[in-house]
Amino acid sequence: MALQITHHKNFDIEAVGFSKLRKNKSGGKAVYLNVSDKKLYLQLPKLRSPYGLSTYTDDTTGKTSYSLDLSLDTDNTEAMELREKLTQLDELIIKTVVENSKEWLGKKFNEAVCREALYKPLVRQGKEPYPDTVKLKILTSSTGDFVPEAYSTSRERVGLDTITKGSKVTCIVDFVQIWFIDNKFGVTVRLQQALLEPSAKLPSFAFLGVDGASETQAEDEFVDEDEEYEE
């Protein structure tokens, strides 16, 4: 399918379609999401990363996987608009799976059971006082390198691992598939590209006039204590 990126403001839930159930050689099952028969790529608004990159290492295989949580902060209007659309997509997915539950899940399930017990939603409810979040999967190559590309606002390539706690990032994501495991299901949302906003935090060892730094340099780099900076 041809590649087409949809801006979050133009994302029409009613345009989302679903493939037939696909099975792989290992017996795994998946249903692919699309828009007008094209893969569903979505450009998200600028969101805050509450943790930076998260890692998980499987004790059995030793393989490390990566993910990126993004906060749907209530003081971010675009984040709230995205939350509403993703919640609508959650509802559409639940209803579609219910309609096809005998084939996709192996038996008939009602909507309440699917919603409360079987489905892992796109919008993950935060515990008070923390906001809801959305989780992005990060693909790695056979050599362990990150597949998604990350850029600075000057369009220069940067390391994906420069996304740290509190970073603000604009992401292009791919809604890959609905996965089914042990009668539970959810959606894989995979990071494709990330645009990082410059950090407002102090750099490491930000002291002035140390190790040969001149007083003139210190004055030039002085920060007004009354100037407000976003945390």
Description of each model-found segment:
Residues 210-231:
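Acidic, Ser/Thr-interspersed intrinsically disordered low-complexity regions
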Residues 124-199:
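Extended serine/threonine-enriched, polar tracts that run as long, contiguous segments within proteins
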Residues 9, 16, 203-205, 220, ...:
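Short non-domain terminal segments
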Residues 1-141:
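OB-fold ssDNA-binding interfaces and closely related basic DNA-contact patches used
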Residues 45, 54, 98-101, 148, ...:
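Generic alpha-helix signal with a bias toward terminal, lower-confidence helices
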Residues 194-212:
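Short peripheral tails and domain-boundary helices/loops at the edges of structured domains
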Residues 102, 109, 152, 185, ...:
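Generic preference for flexible, low-structure residues
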